[in-house]
Amino acid sequence: MPELSHRRRMAVLAICCMSLLIVSLDNTVLNVALPDLQKEFDASVSGLQWTIDAYTLVIASLLMLSGSTADRVGRRRVFRIGLIVFTVGSALCSIAPNLGLLVVFRMVQAVGGSMLNPVAMSIITNTFTDPRERARAIGVWGGVVGLSMAAGPLIGGVLVDTVGWRSIFWLNLPIGVAALILLSLFVPESRAPHGRRPDPVGQILVIVLLAALTFGIIEAPDAGLTSPLVLGCAVLAVLAVALLVPYELRRPEPLIDPRFFRSLPFSGATVIAVCGFAALGGFLFLSTLYLQNVRHYSALHAGLWMLPMAAVTFVSAPLSGRLVGSRGTRVPLLIAGLGMTASGVLFAAFDGQTHTVTLVVAFVLFGLGFGFVNAPITNTAVSGMPRAQAGVAAAVASTSRQTGSALGVALLGAILASGITPQRYEATFTDAARPAWWVLTGCGAAVLVLGLVSSGRRAKESAVRAAARLEEAGHVPVAAKR
């Protein structure tokens, strides 16, 4: 990619952030609409989980393929296709006649979404070559997540209360069209010098692993933990892992390059992403159902309740990016872990009569923690890798996020479903949700501990060694690797 002027780099950053906005906004808006979907389609808790997880599961399964494909055939080309598919999928979601087709159309959306965020991050990485400038750009990128969290519940609440839940998908149409036009005008084409070839076997094994794991968790409350269905999913997931790891180790150009994980910071960032986004996915799912179904708030009122959390995330994400650029990843990760853990403890101790101040503090603490977690994950994932493999490295980080989000909704939703009584929904919700909040607390504690472990001197030395090996391997011609 040629060196761009400062103004052109800012334009590229803005366009990439637009893609993140529509993808992030889509999920936050939909969470507010879940109770309305539940009423219109007479949906169970597992049905609501699938409207979220069908999307995140497909994205998680295809992100690495999208990243490597973009590095090989052109990042702008793949980005354009993703915008088109996502926009069309949004239009289809808005006319879905039943829950089953809504889930299918959400999967169409996800196919497009898988081509947006990791490819956009790869474009940003190759556009901003100075480490400090890149860290600030990633901080802005993380701030867009906060913006979507702030705007999503409010916009979603207004639309659901006034027009209906279908209108939430209309939001993506003008943003998607505008991003397509600006993409053609400002973003140059770029690709890796030696893009990796497709890995269909690895791709299939990843899909089987994530699908079996998520399906088994979501369906466990209804089918039973010892049912043939759930046990079959568990066996299938274990088998997929057992086949995937040795197969990828033998591949000269694997879908998931095991050498990435020789870097302790990269491995730590991957697990932190799973834990942090599992907490976020479960948090939004449980909070929305609690506010609307137990406290009987309207969609707009529930959106206003989430505003303190979203506002703090919006403010803290750019600050996290600046801290990463000036002081490294340890401080932001410690703040993130402490905020999420403290919030989880407060939520695990609450009941339906908790004072308003307690709940607001819990929302603010979670927003603070999540706001600080995104920038160090992204910066660690892409900064220690050769620029030629930026797409794949960013895709691994993004896959970890989406996997965490899917597992968070699946696991915390399954815990809720196993303890709740439909005939006494309000009376049993708080006790049924309490174990789920403790799981969220554990996710925050994991972020805290891993933040310490993955940012020390020994961890940094492992990152240097891993990057050197990757650079050395990157200079070996593909033909010589066979």
Per-range role (PLM):
Residues 173-192, 207-219, 236-251, 447-457:
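C-terminal membrane-cytosol helix-exit motif in multi-pass small-molecule transporters
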Residues 188-204, 251-256, 459-470:
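Flexible cytoplasmic inter-helical loops of multi-pass small-molecule transporters
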